[in-house]
UniProtKB/Swiss-Prot annotation:
Pfam families: SfsA, SfsA_N
Species the sequence originates in: Saccharolobus islandicus (strain M.16.27)
Signal peptide: none
UniProt-recorded name of the protein: Sugar fermentation stimulation protein homolog
InterPro entries: SfsA, SfsA_C, SfsA_N
Amino acid sequence: MKERDSRNQIGDLPFRVKEGFSVYEFIEQLYEANVVERINRFLVKVTFNGKEFLAHLHDPGRLKDLIYPGNLVLIRETKGYKTKFSITAAYSNSRFVVLDSRLHNIIASKFLPEAYEKEIKVGNSRIDFKYDNTYLEVKGCTLVENEIAYFPDAPTERGRRHLKELRELMKKGFNAILLILVMRDDAKCFLPNEKTDPKFSIEFWNSIKEGLNVNIKTFKLVGNKIIYVRDIPLCKTNLT
């Protein structure tokens, strides 16, 4: 596995958060629990303090390497949900991987100028952000294998549609950025997950050929803070 030359990695964002700085802090106490079973996409049974609870999982991915019986997770108390707890992170490769996708746009906004728009209607989709002449879509990534970060970990028709919409915007003269937030710090480079969603992979590479900027950032959980670690490049392939 080789990394792509970072000089060819376009898509730098206007506001550069320094490496090692916090981009989010949980105000709730984080508790260790263990997975009993995943009930459905958004519900997981866990054991905490010797009792079983249902916890909300705000991540629709398969997460087979993270949410499985016996694995260690971090939970926090949440209000406004039918469950008392939400899963915040899961243990993998000697680190906790943040799973709550509600945080993605909050984190992404730290790297943008103050004047931006959110949830802009474009065609049949909504693009996460717009600033100046640039549209930016955010994707969260939790799957890492052999130091390569992969997205998606489940087929995503929505993700493919977003790429098509970004290409249409580029044809109209706008800039477009795909911002990928890798919610762990053990990846050295990124690739679209061709095995899981070959259609997304095709759309990804076609979009880059047509001028899509890609920016990939890694993070780690330290105590109750999410820390920005560094940017990583696309992995070197015959398509880069």
